[in-house]
Amino acid sequence: WKTGDVLLLNGKIYTGRDAAHKRMVDMLNKGEKLPVDFTDKIIYYVGPVDPVRDEVVGPAGPTTATRMDKFTRQMLEQTGLLGMIGKSERGEAACQAIADNKAVYLMAVGGSAYLVAKAIKEAKVVAFPELGMEAIYEFEVKDMPVTVAVDSSGLSVHAVAPKQWQAKIGIKILDRKSVV
């Protein structure tokens, strides 16, 4: 996968936000076994809302990935994690950790929590239920739309896309003072 590629994910992914990451890193630091095997898996930075009626989960939009940057290298190196899904750009250290571990960071579209939830076909809590919506869930997804935001070489769409878009549409980015 290359930066900017649009993918439809299918299969099992796990969830985890700030509280779950903190707990997992604390466990790793103590030499404890994690309750989930993340080898070659993807973790989605999300805290799903409770389902209503026939929903599997309620709205399940991505959370800001930069909050997990401080956990990224350790999670990749000690768990065998393949990749992460979130929204927003990643910091330089996280991009380097992704490159060093030949991992990937995918972006789900922020603001589309309801649409993302429709791709989730099954959901169950697999660890840390006391964390509520920040518990670790296992999702079975079908055709979950994501964009490769940082590829396995560490190249970030946030670094390259603005220049590519400018070249394609042939305009310069204007400030408010120059807009007529």
Model-derived regions: residue spans:
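C-terminal binding/interaction regions
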Residues: 118-176
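Feature captures the catalytic cores and cofactor-binding loops of soluble hydro-lyases/lyases
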Residues: 15-144
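Pocket-edge structural micro-motifs
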Residues: 11, 46-48, 150
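Conserved small/polar residues in nucleotide/adenosyl-binding loops
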Residues: 179-180
